[in-house]
């Protein structure tokens, strides 16, 4: 927890950008509300935000979801597909050898984690090209752990694996937690009103 608290400034910058995006949707939406065909998908926005937060925590940089207001590299779509596949195969593991576990199928289909893997590899390559650059993030902590433990017990491949798991797992669970929070607030009027009052009081005191 203390390690995450040290990275709080990274999260704050992404929170600020997320609020700006919400203000744009509320104050100057791309089309008038009366012309919106579908409600705004907040679950999608929350996961875009989560991807950028995890990018900041992991690599000291956003991944561009909120900046572009889009699913960068279809990472969210790919992750959703992978989760659906993994959920099914976890219940019926015998299917895996006929699907992605089949070398012929895997050859013709790109790996569900390929996009996330590419982002991670690019970051590792960037750091190896400039080893003297100072970073204060999770990737740096992983690299420092390898230096402390040694490459025999902590091989280079594990840096990649830890970073991929952090990026994919962290964004998904964070987005789901935010979805759940908003859902239950909307279902619980007293809790919603209490939170709104606390936010209003903090705004008056200049604590936001």
Provide a role label for each language-model segment:
Residues 4-13, 25-53, 64-74, 97-119, ...:
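Cytochrome P450
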Residues 20-35, 61-65, 126-136, 191-193, ...:
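Surface-exposed helix-capping loop/turn segments at secondary-structure junctions
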Residues 41, 112-177:
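Conserved cytochrome P450 catalytic core segment spanning the I/J/K helices
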Residues 18-21, 57, 82, 119-130, ...:
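Generic, well-ordered alpha-helical scaffold segments in large soluble proteins
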Residues 50, 173-198:
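Cytochrome P450 catalytic-core helices
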Residues 84-100, 193-204:
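Short, compositionally biased low-complexity segments
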Residues 12, 31-36, 73-81, 138, ...:
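Cytochrome P450 I-helix active-site segment
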């Amino acid at each position: 927890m203390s390690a995450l608290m040290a990275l709080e400034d990274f999260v704050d910058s992404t929170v600020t950008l997320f609020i700006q995006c919400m203000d744009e949707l509320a104050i100057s939406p791309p089309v008038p509300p009366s012309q919106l065909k579908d409600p705004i998908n907040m679950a999608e926005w929350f996961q875009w935000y989560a991807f950028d937060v995890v990018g900041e925590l992991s690599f000291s940089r956003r991944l561009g979801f909120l900046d572009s207001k889009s699913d960068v590299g279809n990472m969210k779509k790919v992750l959703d597909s992978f989760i659906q596949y993994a959920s099914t195969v976890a219940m019926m593991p015998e299917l895996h050898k006929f699907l992605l576990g089949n070398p012929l199928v895997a050859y013709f289909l790109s790996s569900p984690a390929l996009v996330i893997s590419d982002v991670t590899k690019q970051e590792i390559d960037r750091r190896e090209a400039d080893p003297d650059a100072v970073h204060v993030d999770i990737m740096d902590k992983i690299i420092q752990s390898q230096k402390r433990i040694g490459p025999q017990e902590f091989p280079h491949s594990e840096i990649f694996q830890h970073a991929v798991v952090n990026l994919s797992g962290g964004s998904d669970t964070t987005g789901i937690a935010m979805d759940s929070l908003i859902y239950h607030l909307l279902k619980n009027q007293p809790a919603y009103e209490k939170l709104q009052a606390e936010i209003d009081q903090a705004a008056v005191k200049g604590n936001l």
